[in-house]
Amino acid sequence: MCIRDRNTFSDKIGLKTYSRGMGALGLPGDLSSASRFARVAYTKLNSVSGDGEEESVSQFFHILGSVDQQRGCCKVAEGKYEITIYTSCCNATKGIYYYTTYDNHSINAVDLNREKLDGRELVRYPLDEKMKINYVN
């Protein structure tokens, strides 16, 4: 657990907290910002992606999944936890926005070219947050 400005790793070690997630400092994969940044940079630089759009998008979400915040690991207030609410990327050339949410890891896409690009109305889409489980039997 982590609460800002509080060392929850051990009262026997004088750790100075500079980031939420430091309650796990010293454990492999701690949740501090610096550790998460280093882990995602390492993962990005050492992972292999295919040439296609779908493979690249899938790999992007796997890379960022290496630093997801899970509910319960980083407590910020009573009953409140730091989590990865959503993850997103965009193919700026094709105008496609991809996202996943905490509760729905299916990749959702919004193709901006399917809308009136010269329109004057704001277009909004509800986040698809309901988990979809694909039963194969």
Regions found by a protein language model. Give the residues of each.
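C-terminus-biased signal that marks the final domain/tail of proteins
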Residues: R4-N137
